[in-house]
Amino acid sequence: MTRRILPLVIFFVLMGFLAQSLFDSDSELPSPLIGKSIPQFTLQNLITEEMHSNEEIIGEISLINVWATWCVGCEIEHEFLVELSQDENLDIPIIGLNWKDDDQLAKLWLNQLGDPYSIVLKDPEGKTAIDFGVYGAPETFLIDSNGIIHFKHIGPLDREIFERDILPVLGELN
């Protein structure tokens, strides 16, 4: 009898741990890059086709948002990003990192939904995203004026998350 009960008990304990991890809504995975400089890169601007490097980000606090047209979460957060980019009380550039996407679809998407980005960099092979430790889109990074990563959010960004998680860090940086 004990031989039959013990596997059931172990099974239910494991299922409990699984259920807890599935319903844990913490989308801030620890990143080994927090407190470190942004990775070096040279990428082409999606709109102007100019080349940009990580050095250009240094000098002001900014957000880097990893997105793609095929990403459902990116569409969910996009309206908030447009609002954020137009907020005169919050002067923070949003740099878009278009990840593994089709250039024409990405340009069309921005034309139709609005372009919240001060610069839109394209990462067609995803190499720069890998250097940032990106798991999937959307992901957003808060970068200080020295190019140091202070915060990483995985998933769609909205006002609640921005005010709860990013604004306090911004306050410390200012």
Functional labels for PLM-detected ranges:
Residues 3-4, 76, 134:
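Hydrophobic alpha-helical transmembrane segments of integral membrane proteins
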Residues 40, 91-92, 117-118:
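A generic structural signal for alpha->beta connector loops
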